[in-house]
Amino acid sequence: IQEVKKLAAKKGFVIYDEPYKLNIWGFRANSNIPNSFDDEIHIFTNIAKTGRPVWSYLVFKCTTDPGTYWLRNPMNPQGTAILNPGQYINSHGLGLHRGKYKALVQIGRVSVTRDYDRDAILDFNNGKVVTGLYGINIHRASKVGDTIRVDKYSAGCQVFKNGGDFDFFMKLCEVHRKAHGNKFTYTLVDERMESRKSLKNLAIGAALVALVFGGFFLIAPDNNTNEDE
């Protein structure tokens, strides 16, 4: 929880500490391999009714990316939607996914990148960014057990790999709804972007160290010469 708090502070994201109010964070893996459940959804909440927060923290496997079927066959002519990283306040509520089963459905605006080239490769840095209501729901893949490949299960939705994990998540959402109403905030972090920023900062830091030490060695001979004289 401390690492997430640091990340939230750095990005200006909200962490809710009201009892039983869910923090729902997706972490997109440092990978561009399509059709795999290689991402994570982190659910954490304060379970202490009074006093200092006592955090319950759960991690579930998921995908935050569309499957290859929809990358090749987008429902929208501009391309398949890939959710952009960010924090989307009150973006979701309990409802029915495609009218079939209970899930968190999109009720507020989110930003997506339209992957338009239909090559089944996840293009996170190319394409058109748009903001609006696109049915970016949080739901499950197969009802029972693990699902191995994303395929048609995601056209941009955030999808749980395991049906049982999702059922448990729905129970947590019901507790949240009863205590705080039917609005949920979803936060998506792209670990590749964070890794690139870390590497960039590391490179800048290394360059500064090199300049400092390089400057010292450039100055040192002159100082030594003056002392000898």
Regions found by a protein language model. Give the residues of each.
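Cell wall/extracellular polymer interaction/catalysis modules
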Residues: 1-151, 165-174, 180-184, 191-193
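Helix-capping/helix-break motifs at membrane-protein junctions
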Residues: 161-162
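Residues immediately within or flanking Cys/His clusters that coordinate Zn2+
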Residues: 154
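Short hydrophobic alpha-helical membrane-entry/anchor segments
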Residues: 195-205, 210-229
